[in-house]
Regions:
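Aromatic pocket-lining residues of Rossmann-like dinucleotide-binding sites
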Residues: 43
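Nucleotide-activated chemistry modules centered on ATP-dependent adenylation/adenylyltransferase
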Residues: 1-38, 46-208
Length: 208
């Protein structure tokens, strides 16, 4: 089975937008400011973006607020070609714990993470449909630790369910992850050492 090049698909979409002089709207699910840094710098050249900060997997309120505030600060400090807005999803850790019930002991990157991806991407697709966005996608594919093919498959599935276009991506390509590190340093962004949930925090602590 041939491996799908999601960055190549995105390149094709962007090329078509440029040929038609079209600037569509994009609802971008964002997990944190560092991951969003390159994605926003890159995509804002071609899309009118609204950041959707929806991360009920972050179990500690202080951590959640810190990440949200860093996202807002980064957006305010950047000079984007097209304006970038931000909306906040409901912060309900109980929603996350309900979604992953029975999978608490799964390893990082396993079935529990898949459920978390599904929770966040379905909500993003639903909001994109309700607010009439042209596309939706997520910053999660920038992480070397995240399964980009799985994320794209989930996104495509909910695109069909909610009748809204999924923007394929693998943002770690084209040195995207390295660029995010540079941007994070330039803006002194808070870079956490775990994804967000108590389980990933525990695993990170065990590795230290």
């Amino acid at each position: 089975m041939n491996k799908v090049n999601y960055q190549k698909i995105l390149d094709g979409i962007i090329s078509n937008l440029q040929k038609t002089n079209t600037v569509p709207t994009l609802l971008l699910h964002v997990c944190c400011a560092p991951c969003s840094s390159y994605c926003l710098e890159y995509l804002s050249q071609y899309f009118k973006i609204t950041v959707f900060f929806y991360n009920p997997n972050i179990s500690e309120n202080a951590e959640y607020q810190h990440r949200l505030n860093e996202e807002k600060r980064f957006i305010s400090e950047m000079n984007f070609k097209y304006p970038v807005n931000i909306i906040e999803g409901e912060y309900s850790p109980l929603e996350y714990f309900s979604a992953v019930k029975g999978l608490e002991n799964e390893p990082e990157g396993g079935e529990r993470c898949k459920k978390c991806f599904e929770l966040r991407l379905e909500k993003t697709a639903r909001i994109a449909r309700e607010m009439n966005f042209d596309y939706f996608t997520t910053t999660l594919t920038i992480s070397p630790l995240k399964n980009a093919p799985l994320l794209n498959q989930i996104g495509e599935r909910f695109a069909d369910v909610y009748d809204v276009k999924w923007l394929n991506s693998d943002f770690k390509k084209k040195e995207g992850y390295k660029r995010s590190i540079v941007l994070s340093a330039e803006h002194n962004l808070y870079r956490q050492n775990y994804c967000g949930c108590v389980f990933s925090k525990r695993e990170a602590a065990e590795k230290e």
